[in-house]
């Protein structure tokens, strides 16, 4: 009998699928919609301590091969997501991750201090976003390894519970090595989500001769099919370099086969962003069916049988 069930982080997940932070998770209605879907888990919108409107529109555009966005962290503010986690979420349905993306170390520390008692009581899991590429004047923390170390030190100290980190994509072997070495200094970091959008792409419409989003002169994070190979590389790089941590795959998942590739590269959970935005929450049922079909064809009964088993050419 084939099974997509997982036991991770002291939680049971019916399957490895969840949304990516930012998609279908900003409002209470969104979060209830994700809870009602067949996903194995959900994560809330990356939040800041105060509500944010984000960047001016248009700030998201989808194409056949993916999407570009420069949302700028629009969110309802930490108090809303904390209240959802403490009072509103039905944990009997599926586990909840809460994503925070404070614009300073101090802001993150203040939020995780307040989250800790709720996490202890309810079991909500923290995903610390160190990789938003779309806040003007705020560079991605995880591209500055000393800053990343400081954030992880301070959050580990203030939170005192297991948590995960949402990473940007890296493109250099030396950066994989350094980033993994920093992560490995922190035993409370139990999972690493690879990857956030590929920052600062530029999409131009040939007809109008114009960029397609307004913020940052049209520069924005790329998602979707454009980034699948980059996401797989990052998943596999951190899977190999962080043997004591889980890796969550994110980027370019439109089909069960895409998810299969993420798991083959080393992913435990698989997050869906652009394709969920475009197709809606019904996508999770389709992804589960397609993944089970591939497993049946290949004779795999559990995800563990092929996780991280990608073959290299000798």
Swiss-Prot record:
FMN binds at residues 21, 45-46, 129, 166, 195, 224, 251-252, 273-274. It holds the Pfam family DHO_dh. Optimum temperature is 37 degrees Celsius. It is found in: Cytoplasm. Substrate binds at residues 45, 69-73, 129, 134, 196-197. Optimum pH is 7. This is Dihydroorotate dehydrogenase (fumarate).
